[in-house]
Amino acid sequence: MTEQTKRTTIVLFSGDYDKAMAAYIIANGAAAYDHEVTIFHTFWGFNALRKEELIPVKKGFLEKMFGKMMPRGADKMGLSKMNFAGMGPKMIKNVMKKHNVLTLPQLIEMAQEQGVKLVACTMTMDLLGLQEKELLDDIDYAGVAAYLADAEEGSVNLFI
C-alpha cells in the first residue's frame, strides 16, 4: 500500500493576532506530521506578512491610506476579542511569555523553516496597494486558482 502525500491548506483571511496564531500553530503542527502545508494570505491576513519597518514605495492616495490603517508586522496585530484599545495584545503576550509560548513572528519563522509555503494573494495585493518589497522575504505570490489547486489535493482545508 502506498502512502498518499498529506496536504493541509489554510486561508488566512483574518487580521487578528489570535486567529493568525491559531493558523500558524496548526500549520506548524501539520508540517511536523509530514503534511505539505500552504497558508494562503488574503485581505487582512496580509498583516502577518507585512514587514515591521516602513518601506518607501510609490503609492496612490487610497493605497497609502490602507497602508496606514493596517498594522505593520505580525507583532502589531490586535486581538479578535478583548483588544481593549491595544492593551489586550500586551496582556496576552505577557501571559504567553510566562508560559514559554512562541510569539506569532516566531511561529511564522518556524513555519518557513519547516517548509510551509506562505502565499500572498496577488489580487488582494492589487486591491490594497501592497508591493512585494513590503512583505516578508521568501514567500510566494499567486492567485486564487493556485490556492484551489492546492486545496483540491488537501486532506485538511481551513478558513481562518
Swiss-Prot record:
Classification via PANTHER family: CONSERVED WITHIN P. AEROPHILUM, PEROXIREDOXIN FAMILY PROTEIN
One of the Pfam families matching this protein, by short name: DrsE_2
Protein name per its UniProtKB record: Uncharacterized protein YrkE
Cross-referenced InterPro entries: DsrE2-like, DsrEFH-like
Organism: Bacillus subtilis (strain 168)
